[in-house]
């Protein structure tokens, strides 16, 4: 597996504070039962959320989709 780094995510969302908010929100959604958009491979929700962001499958729009 390719290691997900903050730099990979910052290419998609240049503001690190917005990126952190989006990743935390998406991780909360995943922990509450949302379907992962990438292969979770037994990773924790936070890692899966970062993998989704690095792959370009999730962005700032996750903050506007309602409650986690």
From Swiss-Prot:
GO biological process: DNA-templated transcription
Catalysed reactions listed for this entry: RNA(n) + a ribonucleoside 5'-triphosphate = RNA(n+1) + diphosphate
A cellular component term, taken from the record's GO annotations: DNA-directed RNA polymerase complex
Enzyme Commission number(s) from the entry: 2.7.7.6
InterPro entries: DNA-dir_RNA_pol_omega (IPR003716), Pol_omega/Rpo6/RPB6 (IPR006110), RPB6/omega-like_sf (IPR036161)
SMART domains: RNA_pol_Rpb6
Family statement drawn from the similarity comment of this UniProt entry: Belongs to the RNA polymerase subunit omega family.
Subunit structure: The RNAP catalytic core consists of 2 alpha, 1 beta, 1 beta' and 1 omega subunit. When a sigma factor is associated with the core the holoenzyme is formed, which can initiate transcription.
Annotated protein name in UniProt: DNA-directed RNA polymerase subunit omega
Organism: Dechloromonas aromatica (strain RCB)
């Amino acid at each position: 597996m390719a290691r997900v780094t903050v730099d990979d995510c910052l290419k998609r969302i240049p503001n690190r504070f917005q990126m952190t908010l989006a990743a935390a929100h998406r991780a909360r959604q995943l922990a509450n039962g949302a379907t992962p958009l990438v292969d979770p491979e037994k990773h924790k929700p936070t890692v899966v959320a970062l993998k989704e962001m690095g792959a370009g499958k999730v962005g700032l729009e996750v903050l506007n989709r309602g409650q986690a």
